[in-house]
Regions:
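Contiguous N-terminal and early-domain "leader" segments and peripheral loops that mark the onset or edge
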Residues: 1-2, 95
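Terminal connector regions
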Residues: 9-47
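Beta-strand/loop-rich accessory regions of lumenal/periplasmic or secreted enzymes
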Residues: 37-332
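Short, small-residue-biased leader/transition segments that mark boundaries at the very start
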Residues: 3-8
Length: 332
């Protein structure tokens, strides 16, 4: 197994039952059954980035620019959002669409009205370390979909070497009834190569993941989708230890977490998939950029296309705080 920096060292055994002779119903080598047994998932602790170099800040009433050697990021202070991330003069973020809340997921064939998300900035502040080795950026927001409001915070610790630790908190209340608590961002077109250590290679969800074994997998973003009779939110991967979004030369950005996370990487937003009526309509909605979602939690799928929903243990709970932590760092 390849070893990667910050990779959680899991131990597991894959067991396969395979035909050793051809029968009337299957050829030799056909897999009858398979199972993965998790032997060890050790607890890990976050490690601060050992960063050399110093950070320079420049601020205006509408933006905050953070620069260091071969690294630059910019925040729109009115929106409390990262709008630029650049490593070695190569952009990562597309269209100023940095991390922001996403609570939507469309997996129903029943047509409903689209409900846009309204954002309200509650606070934006920053603090530079005395030695200029890192800066903390603190944002507090509210996201409202229809009559449901979700307070959330996204805090960034940004180091001079380009490493960014993200710490997000989402709070639900009595009225909460959304399928997902996630951060979404748009990545530049060149970052088409996806590699991850987590469950795969097929899509998988909280209550539907046993058939997707833990392992290291790679696909293109275009290969991360599914062919459903009616387009819908798709392509989720659970229990992810690290995720790399790269160009053909192997440069890009790496996401990793001490606690495994879920992600999806598609050429469509949830809104695109909502309005695409049939599979052949997807070409009209295809985007050159990649829409990346990293989930704190999302509801399970359940087993009924209509009727009962997911079991209670696979639902986001009301009046609860959910946390999402991960690290972003450059790949060269």
């Amino acid at each position: 197994r390849r070893q990667r920096q910050m990779c959680i060292r899991d131990s597991y055994i894959n067991v396969y039952v395979i035909l050793n002779e051809t029968t009337s119903w299957g050829k030799a080598g056909h897999t009858i059954a398979e199972e993965q047994f998790i032997i060890q998932t050790p607890a890990t602790a976050a490690h601060a980035s050992k960063s050399s170099g110093t950070i320079t800040l420049a601020a205006d009433k509408n933006w905050l620019r953070i620069t260091a050697d071969n690294f630059e990021t910019v925040f729109n202070t009115d929106e409390a959002r990262m709008i630029l991330l650049r490593y070695h003069n190569s952009d990562i973020i597309y269209g100023h669409e940095g991390l922001t809340y996403n609570g939507y997921r469309y997996i129903s064939n029943n047509k409903r009205d689209w409900k846009p998300t309204a954002f309200k900035v509650k606070d934006f502040s920053y603090q530079l370390a005395e030695d200029h080795s890192y800066v903390k950026v603190i944002t507090k927001m509210e996201a409202t979909i229809d009559n449901i409001t979700v307070p959330y915070c996204v805090n960034y610790t940004i180091y001079a070497n380009g490493t960014i630790d993200v710490d997000a908190t989402f709070t639900t209340n009595d009225h909460f009834n959304l399928p997902r608590l996630a951060l979404q961002m748009s990545l530049c077109q060149r970052l088409e190569q996806v590699e991850w250590y987590g469950r795969g290679p097929i899509e998988n969800y909280w209550d539907r993941k046993d058939a997707a074994f833990l392992g290291i997998y790679s696909k293109t973003v275009s290969e991360m989708g599914e062919n459903y009779g009616r387009p819908q939110s798709m392509g989720n991967r659970c229990d992810t230890r690290w995720l790399e979004m790269k160009d053909k030369a192997g440069s890009g950005i790496r996401f990793s977490g001490d606690v495994p996370f879920e992600f999806s990487a598609l050429h469509y937003t949830d809104k695109d998939l909502f309005f695409a009526r049939y599979g052949h309509d997807l070409g009209n909605f295809h985007r050159a950029e990649t829409i990346l979602n990293i989930n704190a939690i999302q509801n399970g799928l359940g087993n009924a296309s209509c009727g009962p929903g997911p079991l209670p243990q696979y639902l986001i709970q009301k009046n609860k705080e959910y946390n999402l932590k991960f690290r972003m760092e450059p790949i060269r």
